[in-house]
């Protein structure tokens, strides 16, 4: 059913809006989820006209449109207001424009606000939305905020309090685009729609879980931002722990947003808080030095533009989380994430316990691999007999990949997540309880590192991280399942 809504985007001139938001809204328009009864108000400091704003929107969607006319018709629903987030008069003008558009498009007073700006402006915007009576209790009123949601627990808590002065928790949608990816959402299907997995998805059968977010790129033009953030804040506090919660949660009573969210929150509340000594042993950090991949030489992190040449910011982090629940108590959830690694990819490996062998030789563990990007799909390794006269065993892989046609037809993450917000489905968004629990644990690791309580390991560009990451798993009697650097070295592609 087509949504009736006025969407207001704060930060409408920014890169995210052009690359993600306008194309996602257009796909919703093409699919009929947005039709006649919607309008988009773009706000930013730049003094754009409506005509110029429309041209920006058309340019961002032209490759997706069936015709120029279709793109222009969609863009005609867009309106622009030059806006200073600190100026009350600008909010009064925004309220008047919203009222006019609500009447013109018969949007039934439904409002969606998207804060595509730096978090330090979130509280100011929320305060003015209430004081200038833009949030007036008529129709639905929902707020989407981009990460990062704070830089630690204290800033996140302050930000949350500022938003709660205007919006209820149920109205706030903290977006994490990774949760909009098709295969992450398919984890529910793999787990709960297949008896062979759900019955063994516990500490009795699973030895360890491995989560890898690998990037081949360096920090690129984000050096200034990244040097103040680092891999732990940038990737672990949100993406990694959100993915972990989907893997570790108990089966919800029903497939509803409230039941799913309740089970996810339980995982965050059950995250084991290590002792100080365990923190030093279970979490490592690294920083890339120069290296060569496929004949291309890459500079070290400290040589990147806008990066402190003596920086101690981590570009790689690895560790072991534990969930103190009946289902997974004692099972390590290993993670690693880093820049300038061998190959781009997001993989989850569920490593099952090894069976006692009756064949006189050790058996390889069964491994379920979930491929999230760049390819989507999953594989399951099983032990089988090798072809030949002798009875020799070898692991075989049952492999499935989503074909390009299906992948191309599936919604983009932002499209799916905006669709969810329009339909008041908060399943794939972070509740404050999740954010709170994750920051409290991440803050302890950050504090240890800030006090130089753990070494900063270096690793060569093109590798899969420092040796300490591999040593960490060995301490638990495990090893990383995905090691593309081995093949690259064998092929002479790494130096």
From Swiss-Prot:
* Gene3D superfamilies on file: Dihydrodipicolinate Reductase, domain 2, NAD(P)-binding Rossmann-like Domain
User: Which parts of the sequence bind NADP(+)?
Assistant: 11-18, 45, 84-85, 147
**Do you know which InterPro entries this protein is assigned to?**
G6P_DH, G6P_DH_AS, G6P_DH_C, G6P_DH_NAD-bd, NAD(P)-bd_dom_sf
List the keywords (alphabetical).
Answer: Carbohydrate metabolism, Glucose metabolism, NADP, Oxidoreductase
Q: Which residues form the active site?
A: 239
Q: Which residues bind substrate?
A: 177, 181, 215, 234, 339, 344
The answer to whether UniProt assigns keyword Oxidoreductase to this entry is yes
Top-rank taxon: Bacteria
Q: Which GO terms describe its biological process?
A: glucose metabolic process; pentose-phosphate shunt, oxidative branch
NCBIfam families attached here?
A: zwf
| Function per UniProt | Catalyzes the oxidation of glucose 6-phosphate to 6-phosphogluconolactone.
Q: Which PANTHER family match?
A: GLUCOSE-6-PHOSPHATE 1-DEHYDROGENASE, GLUCOSE-6-PHOSPHATE 1-DEHYDROGENASE G6PD
- Name of the protein in question: Glucose-6-phosphate 1-dehydrogenase
From which source organism is this entry? Streptococcus pneumoniae serotype 4 (strain ATCC BAA-334 / TIGR4)
């Amino acid at each position: 059913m087509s949504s009736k809504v006025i969407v207001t985007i704060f930060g409408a001139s920014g890169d995210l809006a052009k690359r993600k938001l306008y194309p996602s809204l257009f796909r919703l328009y093409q699919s009929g989820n947005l039709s006649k009864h919607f309008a988009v108000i773009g706000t930013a400091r730049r003094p754009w006209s409506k005509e110029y704003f429309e041209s920006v929107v058309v340019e961002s969607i032209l490759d997706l449109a069936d015709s120029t006319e279709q793109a222009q018709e969609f863009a005609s629903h867009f309106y622009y207001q030059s806006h200073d987030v600190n100026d009350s008069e600008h909010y009064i003008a925004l309220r008047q424009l919203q009222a006019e558009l609500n009447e013109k498009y018969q949007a039934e007073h439904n409002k969606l606000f998207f804060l595509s700006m730096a978090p330090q402006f979130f509280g100011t915007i929320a305060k003015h939305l209430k004081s200038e009576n833009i949030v007036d209790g008529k129709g639905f009123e929902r707020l989407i905020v981009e990460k990062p949601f704070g830089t630690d627990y204290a800033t996140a808590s302050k930000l949350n309090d500022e938003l709660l002065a205007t919006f209820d928790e149920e109205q706030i949608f903290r977006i994490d685009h990774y949760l909009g990816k098709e295969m992450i959402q398919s984890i529910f299907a793999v787990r709960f729609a297949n008896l062979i997995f759900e019955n063994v998805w516990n500490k009795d059968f699973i030895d360890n879980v491995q989560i890898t977010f690998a990037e081949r790129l360096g920090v690129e033009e984000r050096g200034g931002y990244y040097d103040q953030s680092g891999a732990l804040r940038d990737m672990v506090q949100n993406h990694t722990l959100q993915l972990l919660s989907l893997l570790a949660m108990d089966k919800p009573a029903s497939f509803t947003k409230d039941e799913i969210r309740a089970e996810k929150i339980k995982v965050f509340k059950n995250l084991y808080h290590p002792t100080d000594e365990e923190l030093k042993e279970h979490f490592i950090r690294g920083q890339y030095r120069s290296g060569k991949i496929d004949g291309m030489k890459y500079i070290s992190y400290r040589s990147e533009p806008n990066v402190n040449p003596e920086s101690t910011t981590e570009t790689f982090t690895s560790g072991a989380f534990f969930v103190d629940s009946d289902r997974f108590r004692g099972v390590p959830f290993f993670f690693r994430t880093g820049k300038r690694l061998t190959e781009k990819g997001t993989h989850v490996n569920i490593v099952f316990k090894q069976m006692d062998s009756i064949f006189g030789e050790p058996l390889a563990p069964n491994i379920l691999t979930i491929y999230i990007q760049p390819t989507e799909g999953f594989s399951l390794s099983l032990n089988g007999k090798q072809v030949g006269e002798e009875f020799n065993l070898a692991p075989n892989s049952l492999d499935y990949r989503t074909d390009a046609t299906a992948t191309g037809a599936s919604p983009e993450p932002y499209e799916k997540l905006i669709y969810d917000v329009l339909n008041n489905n908060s399943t794939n968004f972070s509740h404050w309880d999740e954010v709170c629990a994750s920051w409290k644990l991440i803050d302890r690791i950050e504090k240890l590192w800030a006090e130089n309580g753990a070494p900063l390991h270096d690793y060569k560009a093109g590798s899969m991280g420092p040796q300490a990451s591999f040593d960490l798993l060995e301490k638990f009697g495990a090893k990383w399942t995905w090691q593309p650097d081995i093949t690259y070295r064998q092929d002479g592609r790494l130096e």
